Amino acid sequence: MYSSYSLSKRLIYVPILAIQFLLVRSVSSLNLTNEYLNHKCFVSEGKYKHGDKYENNLNVLNKNVLSYDLTSGFLHVSHGEGPDSVTIILQCRGDSFGSNCRSCYTTAIDGFHRRCQRNKGGIIWYDQCFLVISTIKPQLPRKIDFKNTFSMHNPNNVSSEPGSFDKMTRDFLYKLVQKASYPTVVEHQSTYYAAGEKKLGKRKLYAMMQCASDILQCKVCLEWCIRELPKCCDGKQGGRILGMSCNLRYELYPFLRR
């Protein structure tokens, strides 16, 4: 069963389960959830058979990943050569590093195996992380991927002056870009993340944005996301743009760990 929940043309539908996290619930509940959001199987990379070299390389790499502390919330690792090589890219949300990141990775790798059975490549998004698995080793730093993106919005409309709300929201997001695009070094790894809140009359706006640690031009990516918001989220109380390179979200309620 599918909803008409807003998605970009690049990824057309999202299961109705994926919108549950956007419904207003208690802050403690939101902080504990890690909802599945979306996925895409890279069909062009082919499939593997049980026991072949690709599966062995994937298992070796997965075992290695599980041994990392993931303090910086990011991982880009490869194993093997040629068509049987495996690359894993993991980016955890800025408030979900360390053990929370490892937990999200475990959820994501299991979800990938269920939803992209025997596919050699694909991407899967959860609330607290996204995971890319591929036979292709991208040149580093990675270029911005504008193709594999999608949008989601809060089902509730802004009750008054939606145009003014949209403008103030985007003005605030552009200010956050300045902070997010300036790297913070965690465990020798650059992280690009910012979160903030802003008073809007009697209500408060909460927002976050983040770039994958291995991409070029974080600022360009985040500003592109902001320009995409009118296509999905005008007049809505919350919205988000997600992709392989960067993502952002805003709501009228807190949704991050403190």
From Swiss-Prot:
GO cellular component labels: extracellular region
Protein's name according to its UniProt entry: Putative cysteine-rich repeat secretory protein 35
Pfam families, alphabetized: Stress-antifung (PF01657)
Similarity field: Belongs to the cysteine-rich repeat secretory protein family.
Statement: the UniProt record of this protein carries the keyword Cell cycle: no
Swiss-Prot/TrEMBL keywords: Repeat, Secreted, Signal
Localisation: Secreted
Domain annotation Gnk2-homologous: ranges: 36-138, 146-255
Signal sequence range: 1-29
